Amino acid sequence: IDAEYVRMMVSEYERVLQENPNLGILGPTILNATQQEEYHSYIRKKQYQGDGFLRKENIISSGSCISCKILEKIGFPDSRLFLDYVDSEWCWRAHKRGFICGQTDRCQLSHQIGIKTIHLGVMQDILSAPKRYYYQYRNFLWLLHVKYVPRYWKLTNAAKLLLRPFYLPFVTSHITPYYIYMLRGVWDGITQYKKYKNHK
């Protein structure tokens, strides 16, 4: 990210904010660093709201723009969820407080998410480093208990997490570390939930 990108993103934030006073966070259009194609959801349809502004329930926080006043109202990202779903949880919390989130197609950011994208019919998944699966499984089980987390996200991610042990052997030859971190994530997701719930 260079100075020109920052200038453009701040300008876009101010422009979109004028049309949407309840804007919580604005992100760029994220492009796959390898293929230079936009990351998108096969399930959630695009909802453009204004010139170049795409309203979304959650965005990738990389390269995004947010004001300090918004952080005072919504709070900071939940560090208890390190490392996965942190930006998604913040966006859902913002929606709960009456704010909207979205991205602009006037700013683009080349960004590599995980190792590669896996296409699974109507769904897609990201192949990540083995250790990331610990946080994904643990945090998913924790977020299942959070009421403001969208039901569709819980259902689609439940399907992904259940299917992963079956299709990962076909996309990576080093499957054992993946299984180990998945099992650790499930264990801690169940046994440490009370600690997550009670720790502020």
Predicted regions and their residues:
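A short acidic, glycine-rich active-site loop
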Residues: 122-134
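Non-catalytic, C-terminal membrane-associated alpha-helical segments of glycosyltransferases
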Residues: 148-200
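Alpha-helical elements of Rossmann-like donor-binding domains used by nucleotide-donor carbohydrate transfer enzymes
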Residues: 4, 8-12, 89-93, 139-142, ...
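A short, conserved alpha-helix in the catalytic core of glycosyltransferases
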Residues: 70-75, 80-108
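Hydrophobic/aromatic residue at the end of a short beta strand that borders the catalytic acidic motif
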Residues: 1-5, 66, 83
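A recurrent flexible, glycine/aromatic-enriched loop bordering the glycosyltransferase active site
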Residues: 48-68
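Active-site donor/metal-binding and catalytic loop motifs
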Residues: 104-124
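Conserved donor NDP-sugar-binding/catalytic core segment of glycosyltransferases
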Residues: 3-40
